[in-house]
Structures are given as C-alpha cells and as structure tokens.
Amino acid sequence: MIELLQEYWRPFLYSDGQHITGLAMTLWLLSASLVIGFLVSIPLSIARVSSRRWVRWPVQFYTYLFRGTPLYIQLLICYTGIYSIAAVRAQPELNAFFRDAMNCTVLAFALNTCAYTTEIFAGAIRSMAHGEIEAAKAYGLSGWKLYAYVIMPSALRRSLPFYSNEVILMLHSTTVAFTATIPDVLKVARDANSATFLTFQSFGIAAIIYLCVTFILVGLFRLAERRWLAFLGPAH
C-alpha cells in the first residue's frame, strides 16, 4: 500500500505530470455537469408543471428518456454514437465538439443530471402551498416575477434534501467516465492495478477517496439545510 501511494498519490489526487487526473478530474466533471444541469433544469421544471400540454410534454419525454436509460449507455451514445453520424462529422463545429472526450462526457452527465433535477424541482413546485401563491398574487406579483421572487426560491429550498441525494449519486456516477478514456479516480485505479497487480489496494484507495468526498458533500448539505430550511422546523 505504501509503495503504491508513493508512486500514484499525485495521479490519484490531481495530475500525472501532463494532464489533470484523479480527484481533480472527478470534481471537475461533477462540478461542470451539476452547474449546467442545474441552470437548465430551472426553466425546464417550470415548463414541466405548465398547464399547456405542448410545453409540458416535450420536457416530460426528455426526463423519462434520460431517467429511464442507463448513464453508461447515454455516455456511449454521446462519445461514439453521435460521432459516427456522417452529418455530424461534416460540420466542423460538431466534428470538433464530439471528437473531444471531455465534451462528450460532460454533455452526457449534464443531460442526465438535468433530467433528474428537473423532476426534483418540478415536484417541489407542485408541493407549494396554494396560500403562498395566492398571497404573492395579492401583492401584485404575476408571471415571471411570481416565479422569480416566490415560487422558485421556495421550491429550491424545499428540494434541497432531494437535490443533495442527486449530487451524491452524480459523484458516484462519474465512475463511468473511464469509458471515454477520461482519467478520473477510477481510471487511475485501473491503471495502477494494471501496472502493479495490487487490485485491493488500487481500488481501495479509490473507494476511500469517493467516501471522503461523499462525507464532505453530505456535511455541506446538512449545514445548508439547517440554514435554509430552519423555517420548516418546529417553533420554539
């Protein structure tokens, strides 16, 4: 174990000397996909609860599609499937984008987490007390102002416990990135195992890294919940 750490601690944490690897790469994939997925999911969640079918149904189809298929397959489609289409390779911009493994991986991860986050936020919007909305309307708020100042802030706070689970699941899901040759923590562990044949130690180090990051994320979300969801607790 000590010899393995002495040789591979840098690749496991941040770099192999030439590229970003290991934990740094995993955190980059997680952050990029979560930020994109979060931003896109806000308007999609509003559309998801729309009373207009032509607005609601396309979003519903998208969320069912990406929640109903494995992320591994979604990554393979983005990484190899789309680039195999001649029309994609014929367009310089699309050709450059889908030739890059990082672009394909972030795209697949972002689309996947966006689908789950959209449903989380949509559920929080539906669960809002009707009285809150009526009170806001009584103050003259309507349309986008009603969503911007009342509905979405309340929905985002209430959905925090569920969104924290999605973040943790997304962290664990980044392990499929090695499929696209992305040097994340699992890819470094596989390379270390191939070079040293120390299977238990190689993957054990990877497991410890994921466990530590998970504990940190859980702690941060618990702090956020105590701060932003205090109004839901019992009155003293």
What kind of feature is each model-predicted range?
Residues 1-236:
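Transmembrane alpha-helices and adjacent helix-loop boundaries
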